[in-house]
Amino acid sequence: MNVRMFSLMVGIFSVLNTTQFFIFDLNQKTHICYEAKFSIYVDSKSELVTWTLFHRANISTGLSLTTIIIGCFLFYCIHKNIYMGLLIYAMWIITYELINFSIVLLLNGIIKDHFKTLSYLHWIFQISHMLLHFFCLPFIVKHAYNLYKESQTVGRKRRHRLCSTIAVNS
């Protein structure tokens, strides 16, 4: 298998994996009982934590949909041999995982003691998600580097051919 094929597999993996974790995030229960609205989180005095908890579904939706779109953009860039698109994908995955890690870190601090085992599940999901994404990044970067080197070689040949044509016409 060549680096291009690995990059395509990374794109497929990224879209499917992001979709899977997006579904997990949307189906996560934070309240139990309909009348009492018993929350698994304690009340926090931090505005950032409260805002993150309140807008978690919107943040997850925005990040996941952006990642899926950028994953599809990765397919296009691999097909058209655009190395800059592969680098954009790599930078986005790093940003995406750091934001998700920050959210898990913030929200695990306010989980009630009765639900602490749930925080371990959050950590396992987050760390496995990060490891899987970060394991794939070297293949993307290597393919981008190969495309960059290839474009430099083609540029030199084109300049050499253009200079030869101008010299013959003179």
Swiss-Prot record:
It is a multi-pass membrane protein. Residues 1-21 form the signal peptide. Keywords: Membrane, Signal, Transmembrane, Transmembrane helix. Residues 22-58, 107-120 are lumenal. Its main location: membrane. This is Transmembrane protein 217B. InterPro entries: DUF4534.
